[in-house]
Amino acid sequence: RDPGLAHPPARRGPSRPARRAFLGTAMAMAAGGAAVAVWPPLSLWPSLLDYTADFRTGTAEQRELALSDQLHVQMNTQTRINQRGAQAGSAAIELVAGEAQVEAAGSGAPVIVYAGAGATRARQARFNLRYTGPEVCVTCLQGTVDVQWAGAQRTLAEGEQVTYDDTGLHAPLAADTAQVNAWRTGTLTFAGQTLAEVVDEINRYRPGRVLLRNADLAARRVRMRFEITQTDLALHMLRDLYGAQLTRLPGGIV
C-alpha cells in the first residue's frame, strides 16, 4: 500500500479572507437585529426600550398609578414613566415618552415631573404633560405649576400651556383644556389641525401603522371628533370627508 494513502488528506478550513467575511456578515446581521429590536420598523411593535421603563402602557391602553399620597398619575397610550429619587421629600417621576395627567396633592415638598430637558413642579395642582416628539407640552388644568428649563422658569395658572424643547422654554399660551382632557373621556377632538397631525394621533391608538403619502392632503386642516376605540371609523371619515384613498396591507398597515 502506498504510504501516501495511509491517512486521508487533512481538510483545510476556510481561508482567512473568507472567515473574516463570514464573521463580518454575522456581526452585521446581529447588529441589524439589535437595531430592529430597539427601533422597530414603522413602530409596529414595542421596542426593547419600552420594557426598561418602570411603568408603561401599550397601544390604546390607559393606566392609573397611585405612587404616593401626594402623587397620582393617569397614563395615556404608548407612555413610559420611570420613578426618580426623591429630593428633600419630593415625589419625583420622569416622563420618558407619551402623555400623562398628574395630580399633586401635597402641602409640603413639591411633586416633580422630569420630561426631556426640563422639569415641572407643583404642590396642589392637576396638569397634563405630553412628550410625543421633540417638544414637551405642559398644560395647567388646576392650581399653578412651575415649568423649569435650564435657568428659565414659567409659572402657569389654570388654563395656560407652555412648550419647551432642546432650544429653550417658550412663552405661555391659553390652552384648549377640553381638547387636552379629551383622551381621558375616550375621545379625540381636532379643530384646525393638519391631517398629518390627525394621522399621527391615530397611530398612537391603533395597532399597525397608517401612512399618509399625499403631501397636499397631509397639509389640509380638518375638524373632526371620534372615539379612541373607533380609529378604523376615523379612517373611513378621512376617506369620505377629505378624499383620502385607503389601501390595506397585512400587519394593520394602511
Predicted regions and their residues:
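A residue-level detector for the "anchor" residue at the start of short, highly conserved motifs
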Residues: 8-74, 78-95, 101-254
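N-terminal intrinsically disordered, acidic low-complexity segments at the extreme N-terminus
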Residues: 1-8
